[in-house]
């Protein structure tokens, strides 16, 4: 069984507050994009085997794809094994949810391969135990994501959008980004999720560009001017709008079409470690 595990970008991201349990309430408009990892699942007797290229840098028990397989087996009582072959393209710790999408692909794929029969809702209940972005990928379509990531509401969209996604060479810890945000005395501009959802429903790329907003930029851009320079370069080169995705450091720039994306890509390539022209999935 072969599965494409797609990256996501956040068109809007707002942090509404910190809960007593330490988790943060968020509201985000998220879309999957054509950039993807490739996952191959094969049945095995009992053992769960993970093969990743390039090789995974974390310990096996900490790898999200492996943890997803182990969690599904534990939750369903299944005793079967699997060989998980993962070809990585999405950069790690980049604000594109590369680990989360792989975990969701393992959950949905092994649910079919093993015949465990869980519904999408039941898979999403397992997914939130792996990470806040994982439930979104059970459906992997444009959505409003709320709570700690467990509330996923699909959104109507008129069609695909084109954009350039670029990742500068900036180290990042998502936990640290949240801690910096908690220290803000005053949060600046917040996203208008309603405006973004309306723009997506109309297929209005220019309006999508105007509505892009991520509150994490307020703590990341001052500390990492490379991200700010990349965003400014996208806007100067003609992007309809640009914003950091997730907790960064990746930046997306909305463009009118694929050709404009190719031109923008060449302009900003020197400022990024990785960059792609992508379209959103609907």
Swiss-Prot record:
Gene3D superfamilies named in the record: 3.30.230.10, GHMP kinase, C-terminal domain
Domain of life: Bacteria
Pathway the protein contributes to: Isoprenoid biosynthesis; isopentenyl diphosphate biosynthesis via DXP pathway; isopentenyl diphosphate from 1-deoxy-D-xylulose 5-phosphate: step 3/6
E.C. number(s) listed in UniProt: 2.7.1.148
Gene Ontology BP term (one): terpenoid biosynthetic process
Binding site for ATP: 91-101
EC primary class: transferase
Catalytic reaction list: 4-CDP-2-C-methyl-D-erythritol + ATP = 4-CDP-2-C-methyl-D-erythritol 2-phosphate + ADP + H(+)
Keywords from the UniProt entry: ATP-binding, Isoprene biosynthesis, Kinase, Nucleotide-binding, Transferase
Keyword Nucleotide-binding: yes
Name of one Pfam family that matches: GHMP_kinases_C
An example Gene Ontology molecular-function term: 4-(cytidine 5'-diphospho)-2-C-methyl-D-erythritol kinase activity
Catalytic machinery residues: 8, 133
Function: Catalyzes the phosphorylation of the position 2 hydroxy group of 4-diphosphocytidyl-2C-methyl-D-erythritol.
Similarity comment text for this entry: Belongs to the GHMP kinase family. IspE subfamily.
NCBIfam families (alphabetical): ispE
Descriptive protein name: 4-diphosphocytidyl-2-C-methyl-D-erythritol kinase
